[in-house]
Amino acid sequence: MWDSVLGHEQNKEFLQNFLQREARPHALLFCGAEGLGKKKLALEFAKTFLCLNGKGDDGCEACRLLNFADGNVSHPDFILVERLPEKRDLSIEQMRDLAKQAAFAPVLSKNKICIVEDADRLTEAAANSFLKLLEEPPAGWLIILLASSEDKLLTTILSRVVKLRFNPLAVADVKKLLLARGVAENESEVLARISEGSVGTAL
């Protein structure tokens, strides 16, 4: 499952088991350096999580509304919070908007999922506002935080999430992805070795 995401097999196994559980944690933290595939796996998982047949294989209406490759994302139960282009951090206004959305139940799928990118870039006020959402999570919600470092996250936030660590990829995995994207053999070898296990760095 999620073969488009290279490596991170332990995290994939956790997420596969997560889907089978009745009692689930309401918040996960994907933590690791930039370019390791945290967002990619979060998006692929979101598609499966919201899928009406549990496969995430584009076979249902929910999947068709989460076409990340084409930028066609209109699923009413999917929320992505990311820094605005002109902003350095995630703002309290964004967290307040998220809190307002928490009042609404799932529309199409059984659950709702919210991915918060750059969660380690929350302002202090935004972090405290977000903490209230974690303390009283809406029914049927799953929140996934993406962060490069947990050091900048409030300890009270860390205590309310299940952490999945993303480690650097093997050189062979980085090279495989580069080749799949049309990079020449010799160049792929060099880029993979200097990438420090980060596809983002290699590209």
Regions found by a protein language model. Give the residues of each.
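P-loop/Walker A NTP-binding region and its immediately flanking N-terminal helices
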Residues: M1-D118, L142
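Non-catalytic interfacial helical region
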Residues: L6, E13, R83-L203
